[in-house]
């Protein structure tokens, strides 16, 4: 798909989502093609994907398991945001039992628990599932690096490589450099966490801008 075609589709979808047409099942075909475009081109439109899941709620006979799996996998790539949880809330009970969807839900559970080694092992056991999502592995690695960056002062180099999906030395050096960490031989120096400690009030909140696409569907 050319850049012009992709931009045209993006504008068409944006127009649909701003009107009552978002509830028209006749628009499912273009919305589903838009999901597939996101998977191929490593783009992400959470609002459009929620609209697809909502249309499946209203029109269960039009449910497409493959498209739903792509939407859920794209939501995984946006951890630690709550996209996956909100997408899961729109799934009909009858489709939650789908084997592939159950596998993706399990991936989300262990990713949320920050069990990155187990996550990597499970993904390696189902390469065909995630290979269709362009940029999937790098997006997950960004989340891993985010957690490592706020958790460790130093980490064993082999352990870090394992957490990042069993990557080789060259790829590991890329991620170490990307996050400004330091290679100290067998250890990777992350940060002096004592310098990052600040007294603050902690509140659990979800930003309104993040909920807006979901509210528009209700």
From Swiss-Prot:
InterPro entries named in the record: ARM-type_fold (IPR016024), CSN8_PSD8_EIF3K (IPR033464), eIF3k (IPR009374), PCI_dom (IPR000717), Transl_init_fac_sub12_N_euk (IPR016020), WH-like_DNA-bd_sf (IPR036388), WH_DNA-bd_sf (IPR036390)
One term under GO cellular component: eukaryotic 48S preinitiation complex
Compartments where found: Cytoplasm
Domain (PCI): residue spans on this chain: 44-205
GO terms, molecular function: ribosome binding; RNA binding; translation initiation factor activity
Record-linked PROSITE patterns: PCI
Keyword terms of this UniProt record: Cytoplasm, Initiation factor, Protein biosynthesis
Family to which this protein belongs: Belongs to the eIF-3 subunit K family.
Subunit organization: Component of the eukaryotic translation initiation factor 3 (eIF-3) complex.
Function: Component of the eukaryotic translation initiation factor 3 (eIF-3) complex, which is involved in protein synthesis of a specialized repertoire of mRNAs and, together with other initiation factors, stimulates binding of mRNA and methionyl-tRNAi to the 40S ribosome. The eIF-3 complex specifically targets and initiates translation of a subset of mRNAs involved in cell proliferation.
Primary location group: cytoplasm
Name of protein: Eukaryotic translation initiation factor 3 subunit K
Organism: Bombyx mori
UniProt record, GO biological process: formation of cytoplasmic translation initiation complex; regulation of translational initiation
